[in-house]
Amino acid sequence: MEFGLSWVFLVAILKGVQCEVQLVESGGGLVQPGGSLRLSCAASGFTFSSYWMHWVRQAPGKGLVWVSRINSDGSSTSYADSVKGRFTISRDNAKNTLYLQMNSLRAEDTAVYYCAR
C-alpha cells in the first residue's frame, strides 16, 4: 500500500513538472504589405538548447501550417516554400529565446503564429 501511494505521488510530481513548460510569443503587430516584423518566443521549464524548435501559423478559419524549424544549436534551418527567402528563423540559447524575422510580408502571411517544441 505504501508503494502504491509513493508511485501516485511520483506521477503527480512528474505531471507538475511537465506543466511548467512555457512558450510565450511576442512581437506581432499590424504592418503594411512589404513590411517587416520580428517575432520572439521566450521558453522556460525545459532545456531549451536541447530541442529543435518550430514556428507554425494559423490563418483565420484555417488549420495549423508549419512555417520553419531550427535545430538545437542553430546550425540547421528549413522553411516552408511559401516563406523561403523572406523569413529567417534563429535562436539564442543563452537567452532561451526563439526568433522569426519576417520580411516582405504579404496579405497571405496574416495569421496567428506559434512557436512549438
Curated annotation (Swiss-Prot):
* Region named Complementarity-determining-3: 116-117
Where are the stretches annotated Framework-1?
Answer: 20-44
Domain of life of the organism in this record?
Answer: Eukaryota
Could you tell me which Pfam families the record lists for this protein?
V-set
Region Complementarity-determining-1, as annotated, extends over 45-52
Stretches assigned to the Ig-like domain: 20-117
Signal peptide (residue range): 1-19
Q: Region annotation Framework-3: residue ranges? A: 78-115
* Keyword Secreted found: yes
- Disulfide bridge positions per record: C41-C115
The alphabetized UniProt keywords are: Adaptive immunity, Cell membrane, Disulfide bond, Immunity, Immunoglobulin, Immunoglobulin domain, Membrane, Secreted, Signal
Q: What is its main location?
A: secreted
Q: Where do the segments described as Framework-2 lie?
A: 53-69
State the residue spans of region: Complementarity-determining-2. Answer: 70-77
Share an example GO biological-process annotation for this protein.
immunoglobulin mediated immune response
TM ranges are none
The places in or outside the cell where this protein is found are: Secreted; Cell membrane
Q: Spell out the subunit comment.
A: Immunoglobulins are composed of two identical heavy chains and two identical light chains; disulfide-linked.
Protein name in the entry: Immunoglobulin heavy variable 3-74
* Natural source organism: Homo sapiens
- What does UniProt list as this organism's lineage? Eukaryota, Metazoa, Chordata, Craniata, Vertebrata
